[in-house]
From Swiss-Prot:
Pfam families: DehI (PF10778). Catalyzes the hydrolytic dehalogenation of small (R)-2-haloalkanoic acids to yield the corresponding (S)-2-hydroxyalkanoic acids. This is (R)-2-haloacid dehalogenase. Its EC number is 3.8.1.9. InterPro entries: 2-haloacid_dehalogenase_DehI (IPR019714), AhpD-like (IPR029032).
Amino acid sequence: MNLPDNSIHLQLPRPVCEAIIRPVPEHRADQELSEIYRDLKATFGVPWVGVITQAVAYYRPFFAEAWRRFAPSAKTHFFERASDDIRIRSWELMGQSFVIEGQTDRLREMGYSVREIGQIRAVLDIFDYGNPKYLIFATAIKEGLLSGRTFGGAAGDARCHFPRSPICQIDPIPVMVEEHHAGGTLSQVYADIKQTLQLPFINSDYKAMARWPSYLEQAWGALKPCIDTPAYQAGRFDINARALAALDALPTAYRMSRDDALQAGLSEAQTDELIQVISLFQWMLSGLVLNVTHFKQQALK
């Protein structure tokens, strides 16, 4: 990728988040929340509820209303296309910016079977497909709270309102290795990922790939040198900009402002907390999109 001279300035600073993050995982969701989770997964066509969603779900009155307002756009051809555009752009950015070596032969040398390599690729496909959707949703929540604007609702192309493909994969939930179950080398890899990416926890993507610990160690080792480069930071800026642009073109108007959050039942303090939490998650997702792309390009060679 030919970067402009000022590409080093195209960075997304990490938001300050002093709030305690309290995700509500699927196995702890009550009936009402489980129904929302199922609808979200079916709408996105994915088998997992992202930690970003689980964290916002802690603020239940807000989350339920935000999803109700966003879901009509998420069920459309436009949303599918906008998410796919981000995924494809991520593929272009990583492929043009970095020399990514294939890992397939190395995995075979390590004893991985054809079946296991296929399973790794299938898991990467799930997150590669779903992460852009979570990014756009998180961007809508964040920008709505911060700006108070109404996004979208003026689609000129009737095709944008067409329903998305009914094909989806909502089961089974990918097997994930939680941090408290990680020992030895995997625990060290988790710690390195969190420190390098400035994460307060390990994302679902890495926990799913940790099902194959030696694979994750190898894949992360190949990605890590890219993280602090101007090309990577400019790529995050680009992905974030595309998510922002998608908001203005949402087929159905979305608005969930700070005042709306208060009217939904949150207190001022809870709303301040929520803004910090969603700002951090939205920031993380632009990098996560690129990282999974890098992993996938490694695995396909």
